[in-house]
């Protein structure tokens, strides 16, 4: 369900005859529309944002949407609440201007503002992207805004498997637009469903060499190349791609986990263990990946470090014991706070969770400055944020259940893996420390006496610029 922008207009048109516009600490506003509009414009130029927003809102209340300056006043209102950090309210005002098309001269400005807001975290994805941009029929936009709309409409068509529509929308994006490369990447990723990996690789390699690639898109391209290399068991190639982006994707702990798996399959057990230790950094505490404990145990097992491997395997229960207990007790998923907390950190569930967190943060920010808006605008913003918070909670609950099911399945699978590893460890102890010939060749890492690299002993303190360089130089106790 998307936010109905008629709700905004309806609130704005509520009769307000006789409302006092002055209050404690607030300047009185004129009842003359021309004076109100001039006051809003002057205050905006002087960066008096609450005063400008008050005057613009009162002007809108004193007239109707057919007024020639109604949308200009709403634009002033949107710009000033945005300047105050109230992005959600601003997005709805911009959306009303773009969607209603009362003043076609302002539609492009409103769409450009929506583009700016969509670059930020925690925006209302369902209302702005999936509701308006995906289906809007807007003409007369400048090339940049036209490319922005075409890109999002093409993405929506791809999500609905409407390939012809997606191709047609993407073809409208000029070659010089930054959205052109994003559209090409989206088409390539969609073609992965055909499993024609060689063709996909070739197209990705070409795209990765394009000029002026945004950093986030470049990271995604190399990440995808790395994942394809991993699936094709080209682990050296996968690591090469991951190494290209690890210093520009420091906020993505799942990248370290993928690097750890690649190192494990190459026999780089010390390096794999170092990357897994890095995942214990407080900055990465939100990562929910039960498999990491299995990988740690498997890496230690390959070094015939049987007791550390056993301890590593049991860390799964130490970290997710409450969630596992709920699963074994057959607690309904919606009633498990442990599984709910884990699901909120899932990448696919991050958008609704971010929207909810952002709404709470922004509502708190509004509450701090509420009295500066005067009673009428404050009441209107109260309604907007009350509705937005309710909708954010509803959306997260709706999507979170699917994430909770995925987390539950991963936890149970990892728990079964732990049982198998513990069994293998028991067998290995009886068998001795002879290395299985089927295992990859162990690559020992030794600290050199000289050289260009400097090695430091890890003291338990994590530093962002060093966290992905950790190595665990455990002794290989296996016998060849």
Residue ranges and their predicted role:
Residues 52-53, 90, 166, 200, ...:
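Single-residue signature of alpha-solenoid repeat helices
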Residues 38-39, 76, 112-113, 145-152, ...:
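"A position-specific structural signal for the A-helix of alpha-solenoid helical repeats
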Residues 26-29, 59-67, 95-104, 132-143, ...:
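Solenoid-like repeat scaffolds
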Residues 24-92, 104-111, 126, 148:
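N-terminal leader/linker segments that initiate helical-solenoid repeat arrays
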Residues 49-50, 87, 163, 197, ...:
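TPR-repeat structural position
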Residues 43-44, 81, 118, 157, ...:
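Residue at a conserved register position within TPR or TPR-like alpha-solenoid repeats
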Residues 56-58, 85, 89, 93, ...:
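Extracytoplasmic/secretory-pathway proteins
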């Amino acid at each position: 369900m998307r936010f109905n922008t008629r709700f905004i207009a309806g609130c704005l048109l509520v009769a307000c005859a006789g409302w006092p516009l002055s209050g404690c600490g607030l300047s009185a506003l004129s009842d003359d529309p021309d004076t109100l509009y001039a006051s809003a414009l002057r205050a905006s130029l002087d960066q008096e944002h609450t005063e400008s927003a008050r005057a613009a809102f009162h002007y809108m209340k004193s007239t109707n949407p057919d007024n020639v300056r109604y949308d200009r006043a709403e634009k002033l209102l949107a710009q000033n609440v945005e300047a105050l950090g109230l992005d959600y309210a601003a997005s709805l005002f911009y959306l009303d201007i773009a969607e209603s098309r009362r003043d076609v001269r302002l539609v492009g400005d409103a769409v450009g503002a929506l583009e700016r807001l969509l670059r930020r975290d925690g925006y209302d994805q369902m209302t702005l992207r999936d509701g308006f941009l995906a289906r809007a029929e807007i003409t007369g936009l400048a090339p940049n805004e036209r490319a922005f709309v075409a890109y999002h409409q093409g993405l929506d068509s791809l999500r609905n498997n409407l390939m012809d529509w997606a191709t047609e929308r993407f073809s409208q994006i000029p070659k010089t637009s930054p959205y052109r490369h994003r559209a090409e990447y989206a088409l390539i990723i969609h073609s992965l469903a055909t499993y024609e990996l060689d063709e996909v690789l070739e197209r990705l390699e070409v795209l990765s060499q394009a000029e002026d690639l945004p950093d986030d898109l470049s990271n995604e391209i190399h990440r995808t190349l790395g994942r394809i290399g991993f699936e094709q068991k080209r682990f050296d190639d996968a690591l090469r791609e991951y190494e290209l982006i690890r210093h520009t994707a420091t906020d993505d702990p799942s990248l370290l986990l993928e690097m750890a798996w690649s190192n494990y399959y190459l026999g780089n057990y010390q390096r794999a263990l170092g990357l897994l230790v890095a995942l214990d950094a407080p900055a990465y505490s939100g990562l929910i990946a039960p498999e990491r404990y299995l990988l740690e145990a498997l890496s230690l097992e390959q070094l015939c470090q049987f007791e550390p491997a056993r301890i590593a395997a049991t860390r799964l229960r130490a970290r997710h014991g409450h969630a596992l207990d709920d699963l074994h007790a057959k607690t309904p998923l919606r009633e498990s706070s442990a599984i709910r907390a884990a699901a909120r950190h899932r990448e696919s569930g991050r958008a609704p969770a971010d929207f909810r967190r952002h709404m709470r943060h922004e509502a708190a920010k509004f509450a701090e400055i509420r009295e500066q808006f005067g009673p009428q605008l404050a009441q209107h913003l109260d309604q907007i944020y009350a509705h937005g918070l309710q909708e954010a909670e509803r959306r997260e609950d709706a999507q979170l259940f699917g994430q909770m099911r995925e987390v539950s399945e991963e936890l149970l699978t990892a728990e079964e893996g732990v049982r198998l590893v513990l069994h293998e460890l028991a067998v290995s102890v009886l068998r001795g420390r002879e290395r299985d010939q089927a295992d990859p060749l162990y690559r020992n890492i030794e600290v050199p006496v000289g050289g260009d690299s400097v090695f430091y002993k890890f003291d338990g303190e994590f530093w962002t610029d060093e966290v992905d360089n950790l190595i665990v130089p455990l002794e290989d106790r296996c016998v060849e």
